[in-house]
Amino acid sequence: MIELTNITKTFAGKQGDIQALKDVSLSVGKGEIYGVIGYSGAGKSTLIRCVNLLEQPDQGSVKVNDVELTTLKSGKLRETRSHIGMIFQGFNLLKTATVYDNIAIPLKLTGLNKKAVKDRVQKYLDIVGLADKHDAYPSELSGGQKQRVAIARALSHEPEVLLSDEATSALDPDTTEAILDLLLRINKELGITILLITHEMNVIQRVCDRVAVMENGEVIEEGYTKDIFISPQLRTTKRFVNSLFSHDIPDDLIDGLSENGQVAKLSFFGESSGDPALALVTKKYDIYPNILSGSITRIKDEAFGQLLVHFKGEQAEINDSFQFLQDQQVHVKGVTYDGENQRVS
């Protein structure tokens, strides 16, 4: 659905050129919710604005639904953009227009007749749960309601793709959850492909099928969300994951425990999160596991749990128990003295 290939973008700055995007490529499948995460200055906002050519890349290919956007004439580009909705952190509502008019005015500009405009506005206000706010003004709405109006406006053009530029970053946690639930429902019920950018890992956790991690204008890590959570490879990715799942314990404690056994992080996903794998290990092997910390949550719609466990016993028995756990679809990682994770073979 969305194919970005070798995208490069450079801006002129007072201290010299700033390369915002460096040969970035990513692919978003039809019906997918794909997240791009990174800290400020990573290049993620520039990247998402290249998808509908609000930013023209210096080089590279931008395809949406197999159409190469970078070669389109202005008229054809406007038509193609009508199939790409976009929502922003700042809502971008007309302060002096009602909720109805904020959605209707852009529709009227496309040439829709009055009845079609009215029907479409009502349809999407119903979808976002604001049917009773038809005549309200933005100043009378909460932040979450303003974002719902912005979503309804984007959906009213009936796009195939929805771009979300930090759409929840200005909202409180409860409102963020409600907006994420709405995006999930839109994706499921309307079949709209969603590409979102964020600096919040909980957003990725709640809604994304796949995720790309950006740093200094580059995609440094990419994969299915569950795989990124289970086995982050690079420091930046680990920082994002640890912002939600931190099992750090003092290095000297790990050092002491490791003198008599081994400390390991166990990750459970989906059906394996409900299996008594650790209990089975104690019956099968001569080891004594001691749970140091743990947590359980969901990644999109599947359970995900982690335990930090000290395994006491002979190393051969511990190694066999690790293999048994991996055979039970439990991901096992050893923990070194400095708190960094290493994969256990």
Swiss-Prot record:
Belongs to the ABC transporter superfamily. Methionine importer (TC 3.A.1.24) family. Disulfide bonds: none annotated. It holds the Pfam family ABC_tran. The gene is metN4. It comes from Oceanobacillus iheyensis (strain DSM 14371 / CIP 107618 / JCM 11309 / KCTC 3954 / HTE831). GO terms for cellular component: plasma membrane. PANTHER family: AMINO ACID IMPORT ATP-BINDING PROTEIN, METHIONINE IMPORT ATP-BINDING PROTEIN METN. It catalyses: L-methionine(out) + ATP + H2O = L-methionine(in) + ADP + phosphate + H(+); D-methionine(out) + ATP + H2O = D-methionine(in) + ADP + phosphate + H(+). CDD domains: ABC_MetN_methionine_transporter. Keywords: Amino-acid transport, ATP-binding, Cell membrane, Membrane, Nucleotide-binding, Translocase, Transport. ATP binds at residues 38-45. The complex is composed of two ATP-binding proteins (MetN), two transmembrane proteins (MetI) and a solute-binding protein (MetQ). The keyword Cell membrane applies. Part of the ABC transporter complex MetNIQ involved in methionine import. Responsible for energy coupling to the transport system. Its EC number is 7.4.2.11. This is Methionine import ATP-binding protein MetN 4. GO terms for molecular function: ABC-type D-methionine transporter activity; ATP binding; ATP hydrolysis activity. InterPro entries: AAA+_ATPase, ABC_transporter-like_ATP-bd, ABC_transporter-like_CS, ACT-like_dom_sf, MetN_ABC, MetN_ABC_transporter-like, NIL_domain, P-loop_NTPase. It is found in: Cell membrane. It is a peripheral membrane protein. Residues 2-241 form the ABC transporter domain.
